[in-house]
Amino acid sequence: MLSLQNQRQPKTTPLTDDYVTSNTVLGYGINGKVVQCTHRRTQQNYALKVLLDSERARREVDLHWRVSGCRYIVNIIDVYENTFKDRKCLLVVMECMEGGELFQRIQDKADGAFTEREAAQIMHEICAAVDYLHSRDIAHRDLKPENLLYTTTQPNATLKLTDFGFAKETFTSYTLQTPCYTPYYVAPEVLGPEKYDKSCDIWSLGVVMYIIMCGFPPFYSNHGLAISPGMKNRIRTGQYDFPDPEWTNVSQAAKDLIKGMLNVDPSKRLRIQDVISNKWIAQYNAVPQTPLCTGRMLKEAEETWPEVQEEMTRSLATMRVDYDQMQIKALDKSNNPLLTKRRKKIEEMELYMANATRN
């Protein structure tokens, strides 16, 4: 079984000697649920992740523990190795991210209050976390909004990356070949038998940035399928666009950066050093304060977004492309369900207002 290579080793004393656990569920990771716990001496609240002991669980804890010193990665406070009902478990105590998920924070902003400059600052923080990982030859492999959490509800809160359930070292004799991914954020090379590496994280960064800028993903699935042949083809061929009116006022610099991250050829795709040194990221304070429609789009798609998140999660680590069954489909902008729903609402509202005016 994989040992925890970090110099620190799990404590074998009972977790309950130091912490009081609760039934309050804070979230669910790839390999286990997260509940709230409280330190007995300090009364400080923390997040507790419970993992059944396995090679995969130990790899997750090992990699996360190694990088938890980064300001933009959720910090591990303690790790315990305890036994419950004859089953060995790893109990991971982490800082409690009281500010919630990235997109919920954006959605809660007033219409027009979220700007391109704020988007650039968010991307700067996410890229700092990825840069820290990649410089240590670790690929996260599950970059998505649900894994980006704020420390507090305050305006100056820090955004941090969490959930290392799919993380993997990239300097070993093998390269990443296991298709662990979330459909909306999956890189083209992950969909096929080709080997892939840290460049798949850059692709995911591009998709996350796209959604941050407008409130909907560049690639989507048709007919409610977790990942359709058409969606796979759009990802493979890089078929997406920047539709109006949502992208009308977004800077060309932002669009160019997204294009660089979504290049279908991993050898030509930007590296994290290229992304983090890009002027739009590095000098985010100079980015124009153009109002974005992201918050409004997320609110108007509030009913749809949880379904999108579920769709993303359903196909994690389960998809392999069957090339013989691949069907080539042309991109049709109007088929994006998130955009279609929003525009239908706008048309209905305009019709209502027109009728009200006539009356």
UniProtKB/Swiss-Prot annotation:
ATP binds at L26, G27, Y28, G29, I30, N31, G32, K33, V34, K49. SMART domains: S_TKc. This is MAP kinase-activated protein kinase 2. Phosphorylated and activated by MAP kinase. Residues 20-281 form the Protein kinase domain. GO terms for biological process: intracellular signal transduction; negative regulation of mitochondrial electron transport, NADH to ubiquinone; positive regulation of cell size; regulation of JNK cascade; response to salt stress. The active site is at D142 (proton acceptor). The keyword Isomerase does not apply. Belongs to the protein kinase superfamily. CAMK Ser/Thr protein kinase family. It comes from Drosophila melanogaster (Fruit fly). GO terms for cellular component: cytoplasm; nucleus. The keyword Kinase applies. Keywords: ATP-binding, Kinase, Nucleotide-binding, Phosphoprotein, Serine/threonine-protein kinase, Transferase. Its physiological substrate seems to be the small heat shock protein (HSP27/HSP25). SUPFAM superfamilies: Protein kinase-like (PK-like) (SSF56112). The gene is MAPk-Ak2. PANTHER family: SERINE/THREONINE-PROTEIN KINASE. It comes from the Eukaryota. Its EC number is 2.7.11.1. Gene3D superfamilies: MAP kinase activated protein kinase 2 (4.10.1170.10), Phosphorylase Kinase, domain 1 (3.30.200.20), Transferase(Phosphotransferase) domain 1 (1.10.510.10). It catalyses: L-seryl-[protein] + ATP = O-phospho-L-seryl-[protein] + ADP + H(+); L-threonyl-[protein] + ATP = O-phospho-L-threonyl-[protein] + ADP + H(+). GO terms for molecular function: ATP binding; calcium-dependent protein serine/threonine kinase activity; calcium/calmodulin-dependent protein kinase activity; calmodulin binding; mitogen-activated protein kinase binding; protein kinase activity; protein serine kinase activity. InterPro entries: CDPK_Ser/Thr_kinases, Kinase-like_dom_sf, MAPKAPK_C, Prot_kinase_dom, Protein_kinase_ATP_BS, Ser/Thr_kinase_AS.
